[in-house]
From Swiss-Prot:
GO terms for cellular component: cytoplasm. It is found in: Cytoplasm. GO terms for molecular function: acetylglutamate kinase activity; ATP binding. The gene is argB. HAMAP family: ArgB. Catalyzes the ATP-dependent phosphorylation of N-acetyl-L-glutamate. GO terms for biological process: arginine biosynthetic process via ornithine; L-arginine biosynthetic process. This is Acetylglutamate kinase. It catalyses: N-acetyl-L-glutamate + ATP = N-acetyl-L-glutamyl 5-phosphate + ADP. Belongs to the acetylglutamate kinase family. ArgB subfamily. Substrate binds at G69, G70, R91, N191. Pathway: Amino-acid biosynthesis; L-arginine biosynthesis; N(2)-acetyl-L-ornithine from L-glutamate: step 2/4. It comes from Neisseria meningitidis serogroup A / serotype 4A (strain DSM 15465 / Z2491). Disulfide bonds: none annotated. Gene3D superfamilies: Acetylglutamate kinase-like.
């Protein structure tokens, strides 16, 4: 038992020593985190995520969280007798569904995340893109193999982001938690894919990192091998051959766009892994897949 404790202590010391250069490097920088998947539904992972976010803030990194809420939305739609439908990974959202989406994201999910972070000593503040109209949206039309310009209801894409609200929260020492609901020119609400919001927000904030938490280890090839580094060219090939499809498409598109437009590192990581954020940011090996803005695959 004593030997095990010594080994454990040695491992902890090694981990701290490995983390120190990264703490120095990233202190003062912004990290936008797309929070979703199992990490949002399993109690132990939810608590671990909250602790990790608080730790990031304590060592000088400024986390900004953009959350999804697909399972929670589906559960509420089922309760009212509506079936969730998707086109190219995007949720079909009529007026009734939009009311439910906004209620679940802004009312339940956002407040739960804020409360969890604050329980562990953080100062999280929840906001929606409709607050101060800081996320302006326009209707998103989807091209499918059968038809171009498919209207899927009150689903939007980001037209512009005014980062003043989020930057103000960061300057006050707060952790912004953003619900991905935008506002149209007539004041109407738009459901925006959280990956799209996270990517665009990372660009506008000149973030050091964009980290997208998901339920898979990262981007895989057809044989199931993890691809640790990818370029836009390689990703185009994976989409063309059908390796990437469905819900991965908006995630990948956002990661690529952010990388191309100046976010220094974009990552797709496995949110099912305890301490996934810390493993990516503070260890030499990292986890998941890194999207590069250009150049050759490594």
């Amino acid at each position: 038992m004593e030997s095990e404790n010594i080994i454990s202590a040695a491992d902890k010391a090694r981990i701290l020593a490995e983390a120190l250069p990264y703490i120095r490097r990233f202190s003062g920088s912004v990290a936008v985190i797309k929070y979703g998947g199992n990490a949002m539904t399993e109690p132990a992972l939810k608590e671990g995520f909250a602790r990790d976010v608080v730790l990031l803030k304590l060592v000088g990194i400024h986390p900004v969280i953009v959350h999804g809420g697909g399972p929670q939305i589906n559960a509420m739609l089922e309760k009212v007798g509506k079936k969730g439908e998707f086109v190219q990974g995007m949720r079909v959202t009529d007026k009734e569904a939009m009311d439910i989406v906004e209620m679940v994201l802004g009312g339940h999910v956002n407040k739960e995340i804020v409360s969890m972070i604050n329980t562990y000593g953080g100062h999280a503040v929840g906001v929606s893109g409709r607050d101060d109209h800081f996320i302006k949206a326009k209707k998103l039309l989807i091209d499918t193999p059968e038809q171009n310009g498919v209207d899927i209801g009150q689903v939007g894409t980001v037209e512009s982001i005014d980062t003043g609200l989020v930057k103000g929260l960061i300057e006050r020492g707060c952790i912004p938690v953003v619900a991905p609901v935008g506002v149209g020119e007539k004041g109407e609400a738009f459901n925006i894919n959280a990956d799209l919001v996270a990517g665009k927000l990372a660009e506008e904030l000149n973030a050091e990192k964009l980290l997208m938490m998901t339920n898979i280890a990262g981007v895989m090839d057809k044989t199931g091998n993890l691809l640790t580094k990818l370029t836009p060219k390689r990703i185009d090939e994976l989409i063309a051959d059908g390796t990437l499809y469905g819900g991965m498409l908006p995630k990948i598109a956002s990661a690529v766009e952010a990388a191309v437009n100046g976010v220094k590192a974009t990552h797709i990581i496995d949110g099912r892994v305890p301490n996934a954020l810390l493993l990516e940011i503070f260890t030499d090996a990292g986890i998941g897949s890194m999207i590069l803005g250009g150049g050759e695959d490594a």
